[in-house]
Amino acid sequence: MNPLISAASVIAAGLAVGLASIGPGVGQGTAAGQAVEGIARQPEAEGKIRGTLLLSLAFMEALTIYGLVVALALLFANPFV
């Protein structure tokens, strides 16, 4: 195995996980903040807001998991070797 390809794969895997988690992390923080603000304004809508928030958080977290899958593929099933 070429050490240059191995090093590039490790760096690419780290970047894949790191960059794939930035967007969803910011989005989840913003969504949670807005949900808390919405519940504070309208406490009677708490159930509907919470359900929508949890569903949207799951979709955002899926993007991070896709980045993790790409990183694991680069580390353990490297297509460049």
From Swiss-Prot:
Say if the entry is tagged with keyword Zinc-finger: no
Q: Where in the cell is it found?
A: Plastid, Chloroplast thylakoid membrane
- InterPro entries recorded for this chain? ATP_synth_csu_bac/chlpt, ATP_synth_F0_csu, ATP_synth_F0_csu_DDCD_BS, ATP_synth_F0_csu_sf, ATPase_proteolipid_c-like_dom, F/V-ATP_Csub_sf
Q: Which keywords does the record carry?
A: ATP synthesis, CF(0), Chloroplast, Hydrogen ion transport, Ion transport, Lipid-binding, Membrane, Plastid, Thylakoid, Transmembrane, Transmembrane helix, Transport
**GO BP, sorted A to Z:** proton motive force-driven ATP synthesis
The record's function comment reads: F(1)F(0) ATP synthase produces ATP from ADP in the presence of a proton or sodium gradient. F-type ATPases consist of two structural domains, F(1) containing the extramembraneous catalytic core and F(0) containing the membrane proton channel, linked together by a central stalk and a peripheral stalk. During catalysis, ATP synthesis in the catalytic domain of F(1) is coupled via a rotary mechanism of the central stalk subunits to proton translocation. Key component of the F(0) channel; it plays a direct role in translocation across the membrane. A homomeric c-ring of between 10-14 subunits forms the central stalk rotor element with the F(1) delta and epsilon subunits.
Question: Which taxonomic lineage does the organism of this UniProt entry have?
Answer: Eukaryota, Viridiplantae, Streptophyta, Embryophyta, Tracheophyta
What protein does this entry describe?
ATP synthase subunit c, chloroplastic
- Native source species: Populus trichocarpa (Western balsam poplar)
